[in-house]
């Protein structure tokens, strides 16, 4: 009997049907050994000896493996084709050797395959190799590094920053990215700027829009027009100008398809297009790889999903090109196959890209056989794979340059059309944080053609802070920085959320107070080890180990000598010194720039400062014990030592920017919720305030939104039939339209701050009967 060992029962079930009766396929159910979560599992003083344990959960599976191995003529180790898979195979072999007294390595045969198909399985079994010690060593080095950081840094964190749970080698760097982005957002001050649009009409009475680009030979930069007065003055001057088409430029642009998916690009695209978390994407991809039931049989539908490689096998390319020719026609098929180059350093790990194992299994043919989410992910992979071998998209681009009579004013109008849809026929990649491009066409225009100016529109804008990271953009950033590897991204994001260091709001990462405390501490006292370059450098070292170019224990020793010294140094630091540093670093976040926000709200004479208790960080009054005011800065901490009214309200006086007169606009939080305020209170004169509607997230309030809230009730236009004003406002029952003395509620589906005149008139018309009834 020949024993085949894989990780999962699903994989075992699929493989079993491809092998004859002489083979028995069983599952290890993942790792059978690991480093126990206790001190002494890695011993730096003993040349980094690693003490592995078989977990209670794995015990029964190990017994079955050992029992079957005793009866076997050979053991085929058929775990996944990466470092983790190689390590699982090595651990299985080591346990069998130890339990069954096996001395010869020839008893073990490593079989690796990139897809679970009959052809791939038979080929792998007929061409076994030995275990790759370099891949095993790279995995052991990663595991040792993670253990050494976690089990030396975390206890230090508990002592120096009570309430903080843990720190990790890679997760802490990802957390730093999220926290630093939030710092940027908090410190950001929005600036006003304007541009001028011209609605033009050609000689055939066709309309198009141009944008003013030059005034008196001076190019208009982003901040050339910074206030309403300048914009209106320029608008008035333009009213007397006659424009013509000065020049027309036409060109074609080619767009090439993206490479087939690797792990990180699949996670990003599934997040953008399908709304899947990285964890969900990998769970579904794992099932599609291991095998799913599609009726009469269980088959692996995609190739291995943890890969950095963008190459496709020659057979796969031939099948893809054949399908393109058959289904879409030869005009969509390039003359030669597209070849994509992989950036993977180690050829042993350079797997194929993620693709369907059989391209003829179209999404339509599987729609009724797959679960909904499985179908969605498979369709995404199938379409990307087809598109990567299709012809370019060809765009016709037109730029029309417009000029006034004396060329004092210049404007430009851009248009584009798709001349040939190429790979767009099948697939278009999403773009994170960008508005969808419009396929904007221009009417036919001729050089020197006179134009009529139908409307001149001054457009007000405000600069916006950088967006918070989504799962897609964070994975992309980690990949760009070289931090982590495809197989680790999903777990990194999950750990940060599980430990309450970050939360997801509207699919964007926000740091929790606990996460900010940890980041400030690590940046202050372990800066080298949360530097992006250093962490990326360690990943490169692991790649070097996997390629056999670096000795793994030498790499561990190089890391540990410096890290251990850093641990010992921080252990000597007094907690008061650490608190002082942390408060200074978090000062802006906790108190903004307003010194008054440090004043104790209870006694009015004391000043708030950061303190650490057994349940975490809090703000306390300097007049203690006379004043016992305390305020938790850790949201959701039910075990804190705080008084009853101490809800987490850090950064209560955030400055959003200034209005046109230079008066600061604040976002504040009061007893009835968040509100925006124009300027500070002077004496008994209260500044203008406006509540933030419950439908809006206070963390998303921009200067532009605040100015609109403060301007309510606001006139949005004149009704075209009655000539009466239409106003919008916000009252105790929510947003409303005021028209002819009557009030109409604005439904939640509308963004009431940006309600158009057309939408307002439609709502008035829809409520006409109700209004007439009230009037009667």
Curated annotation (Swiss-Prot):
Entries under HAMAP family matching the protein: Topoisom_1_prok
UniProt family annotation: Belongs to the type IA topoisomerase family.
Reactions it catalyzes: ATP-independent breakage of single-stranded DNA, followed by passage and rejoining
Keywords from the UniProt entry: DNA-binding, Isomerase, Magnesium, Metal-binding, Topoisomerase, Zinc, Zinc-finger
Pfam families: Topoisom_bac, Toprim, Toprim_C_rpt, Zn_ribbon_Top1
SUPFAM superfamilies with a match to the protein in the record: Prokaryotic type I DNA topoisomerase, Zinc beta-ribbon
Positions contributing to Mg(2+) binding: 7, 80
Enzyme Commission (EC) number: 5.6.2.1
Region ranges (Interaction with DNA): 166-171
Molecular function GO terms recorded: DNA binding; DNA topoisomerase type I (single strand cut, ATP-independent) activity; zinc ion binding
Zn finger spans (C4-type): 600-627
Name of the protein in its database record: DNA topoisomerase 1
Active site: 304 (o-(5'-phospho-dna)-tyrosine intermediate)
Segments forming domain Toprim: 1-111
Annotated Topo IA-type catalytic domain residues: 132-568
GO cellular component terms attached to this protein's record: chromosome
Organism whose genome encodes this protein: Rickettsia felis (strain ATCC VR-1525 / URRWXCal2) (Rickettsia azadi)
Cofactor(s) it depends on: Mg(2+)
Function recorded in the entry: Releases the supercoiling and torsional tension of DNA, which is introduced during the DNA replication and transcription, by transiently cleaving and rejoining one strand of the DNA duplex. Introduces a single-strand break via transesterification at a target site in duplex DNA. The scissile phosphodiester is attacked by the catalytic tyrosine of the enzyme, resulting in the formation of a DNA-(5'-phosphotyrosyl)-enzyme intermediate and the expulsion of a 3'-OH DNA strand. The free DNA strand then undergoes passage around the unbroken strand, thus removing DNA supercoils.
UniProt-listed InterPro entries: Topo_IA (IPR000380), Topo_IA_2 (IPR003601), Topo_IA_AS (IPR023406), Topo_IA_cen (IPR013497), Topo_IA_cen_sub1 (IPR013824), Topo_IA_cen_sub2 (IPR013825), Topo_IA_cen_sub3 (IPR013826), Topo_IA_core_domain (IPR023405)
């Amino acid at each position: 009997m020949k024993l085949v060992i894989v990780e999962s029962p699903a994989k075992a079930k699929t493989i079993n049907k491809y092998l004859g009766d002489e083979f028995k396929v069983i599952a290890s159910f993942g790792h059978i050994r690991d480093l126990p979560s206790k001190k002494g599992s890695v011993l730096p003083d003993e040349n980094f000896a690693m003490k592995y344990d078989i977990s209670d959960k794995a015990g029964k599976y190990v017994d079955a493996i050992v029992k079957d191995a005793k009866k076997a003529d050979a053991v085929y180790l058929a775990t996944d084709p990466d470092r983790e898979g190689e390590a699982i195979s090595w651990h299985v072999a080591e346990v069998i050797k130890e339990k069954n007294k096996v001395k010869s390595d020839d008893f073990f045969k490593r079989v690796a395959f990139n897809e679970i198909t009959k052809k791939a399985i038979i080929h792998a079994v007929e061409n076994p190799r030995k275990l790759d010690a370099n891949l095993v060593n790279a995995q052991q080095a990663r595991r040792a590094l993670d253990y050494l950081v976690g089990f030396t840094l975390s206890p230090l964190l508990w002592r120096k920053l009570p309430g903080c749970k843990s720190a990790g080698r890679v997760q802490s760097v990802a957390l730093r990215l999220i926290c630093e982005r939030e710092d940027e957002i908090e410190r950001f001050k929005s600036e006003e700027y304007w541009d001028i649009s011209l609605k033009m009409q050609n000689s055939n009475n066709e309309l198009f829009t141009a944008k003013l680009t030059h005034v008196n030979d001076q190019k208009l930069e982003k901040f050339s027009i910074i206030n309403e007065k300048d914009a209106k003055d320029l608008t008035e001057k333009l009213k007397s100008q006659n424009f013509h088409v000065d020049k027309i430029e036409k060109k074609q642009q080619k767009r090439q398809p993206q490479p087939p998916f690797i792990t990180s690009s699949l996670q990003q695209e599934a997040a953008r297009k399908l709304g899947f978390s990285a964890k969900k994407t990998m769970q579904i991809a794992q099932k599609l790889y291991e095998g799913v039931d599609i009726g009469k049989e269980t088959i692996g539908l995609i190739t291995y999903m943890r890969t950095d490689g963008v190459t496709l096998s020659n057979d796969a390319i031939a099948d893809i090109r054949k399908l393109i020719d058959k289904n879409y026609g030869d005009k969509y098929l390039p003359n030669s196959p597209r070849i994509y180059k992989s950036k993977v350093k180690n050829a042993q790990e350079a797997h194929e890209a993620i693709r369907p194992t059989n391209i003829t299994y179209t999404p339509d043919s599987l729609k009724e056989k797959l679960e909904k989410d499985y179908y969605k992910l498979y369709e995404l992979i199938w379409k990307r794979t087809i598109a990567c071998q299709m012809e370019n998209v060809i765009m016709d681009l037109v730029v029309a340059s417009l000029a006034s009579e004396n060329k004092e004013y210049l404007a430009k109008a851009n248009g584009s059309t798709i001349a040939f849809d190429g790979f767009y026929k099948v697939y278009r990649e999403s773009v994170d944080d960008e508005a969808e491009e419009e396929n904007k066409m221009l009417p036919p225009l001729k050089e020197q053609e006179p134009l009529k100016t139908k409307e001149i529109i001054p457009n007000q804008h405000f600069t916006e802070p950088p967006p918070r990271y989504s799962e897609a953009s964070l994975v992309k950033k980690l990949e760009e920085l070289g931090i982590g590897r495809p197989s680790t991204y999903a777990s990194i994001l999950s750990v940060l959320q599980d430990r309450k260091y970050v939360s997801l709001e509207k699919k964007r990462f926000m740091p929790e107070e606990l996460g900010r405390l940890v980041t400030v501490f690590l940046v202050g006292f372990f800066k080298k080890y949360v530097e992006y370059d250093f962490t990326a450098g360690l990943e490169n070292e692991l790649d070097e180990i996997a390629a056999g170019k670096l000795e793994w224990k030498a790499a561990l020793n190089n890391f540990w000598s410096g890290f251990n010294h850093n641990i010992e140094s921080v252990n000597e630091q007094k907690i008061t010194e650490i608190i002082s540093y942390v408060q200074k670093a978090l000062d802006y976040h906790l108190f903004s720039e307003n010194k008054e926000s440090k004043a104790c709200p209870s006694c009015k004479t004391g000043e708030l400062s950061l303190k650490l208790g057994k349940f975490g960080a809090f703000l306390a009054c300097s007049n203690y014990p006379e004043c016992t005011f305390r305020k938790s800065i850790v949201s959701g901490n039910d075990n804190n030592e705080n008084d009853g009214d101490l809800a987490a309200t850090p950064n209560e006086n955030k400055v959003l920017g200034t209005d046109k007169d230079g008066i600061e606009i604040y976002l504040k939080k009061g007893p009835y919720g968040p509100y925006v305020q124009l300027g500070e209170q002077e004496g008994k004169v209260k500044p203008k305030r406006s509540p933030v509607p419950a439908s809006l997230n206070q963390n998303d309030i921009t200067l532009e939104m605040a100015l609109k809230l403060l301007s309510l009730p606001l006139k949005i236009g004149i009704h075209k039939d009655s000539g009466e004003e239409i106003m919008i406002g916000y009252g105790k029952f929510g947003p409303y339209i005021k028209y002819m003395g009557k009030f109409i509620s604005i439904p939640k589906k509308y963004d009431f701050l940006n309600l158009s005149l057309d939408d307002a008139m439609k709502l008035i018309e829809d409520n006409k009967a109700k209004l007439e009834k009230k009037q009667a």
